[in-house]
Design a protein with these regions (language model features):
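Extracytoplasmic gate region of multi-pass secondary transporters
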Residues: 1-49, 106-110, 114, 141-149
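C-terminal transmembrane helical hairpin of 12-TM major facilitator-type secondary transporters
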Residues: 64-113
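A membrane-interface helix-boundary motif in multi-pass transporters
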Residues: 63-69, 150-183
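Transmembrane alpha-helical cores of Major Facilitator Superfamily
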Residues: 35-39, 100, 131-139
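A late C-terminal transmembrane helix in Major Facilitator Superfamily
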Residues: 118-157
Length: 208
């Protein structure tokens, strides 16, 4: 679910700045915006490994509980995506900064998500579980990117007849996808918490 958000911004960010502001991907302004976006992601995502360590070492939490609490905090970062399109009316730098913060939240979330596998599953199964998760993430990424493209094409064709939260046409399509991306992490966290409400190591019988 959440991998698709990351790949959406990887794939569509240049097109977004081109569609909304007319900056071609190879223009100096577009390059500056994309550079800023990923600089924010790179610098801030480093803190993704520190927060759960703080909860475990300083607060004495169980590793799973500390990691889940950290992931809940990281899941709130993407909520900033709700403001990317509205703030973009003032300057293209706002979406670049907001998407960068969202991306940093994703990287921190993703690092801890994969670490929960090591917390719960035996070492002999970690590679398999990680591979299955990566495959599911790839499928989700394909679906959100393909679906977004279809939505943008449809919204652009409808023009002012297609509206959402004060935006018409293709901008309305972007606003819809930004809303989905913003909420995906909290939904993912709730699903994880519902499936695994308490820490319980999973034992696999390899004698069968």
């Amino acid at each position: 679910m959440t991998d698709g958000v990351w790949w959406f911004f990887l794939f569509w960010a240049p097109a977004y700045f081109s569609d909304q502001y007319g900056y071609e991907s190879d223009s100096p302004m577009a390059i500056a915006l994309i550079f800023t976006l990923y600089a924010i992601v790179t610098i801030l995502s480093i803190g993704g490994g520190y927060l759960p360590t703080y909860f475990v070492d300083k607060k004495g939490m169980n590793p799973y509980i500390g990691r889940m609490r950290a992931m809940l905090i990281f899941a709130c970062f993407p909520l900033l995506g709700l403001f990317a399109q509205p703030m973009g009316a003032f300057s293209p730098w706002w979406p670049a900064i907001i998407i960068g913060l969202l991306g940093a939240g994703h990287q921190a979330w993703s690092a801890n998500l994969y670490s929960t596998i090591g917390d719960m599953f035996p070492k002999s199964t970690i590679a398999t579980i990680t591979g299955i998760g990566a495959m599911a993430g790839g499928i989700g990424s394909f679906l959100i990117n393909k679906g977004s493209g279809l939505l943008f094409t449809y919204a652009e064709g409808q023009g002012s007849a297609f509206s959402f939260m004060g935006f018409d046409g293709k901008p309305a399509g972007y606003m819809i996808v930004f809303c989905i991306c913003a909420l995906a992490y909290l939904v993912g966290w709730i699903i994880m918490k519902a499936l695994v409400p308490k820490y319980k190591p999973i034992i696999v019988d390899l004698t069968l």
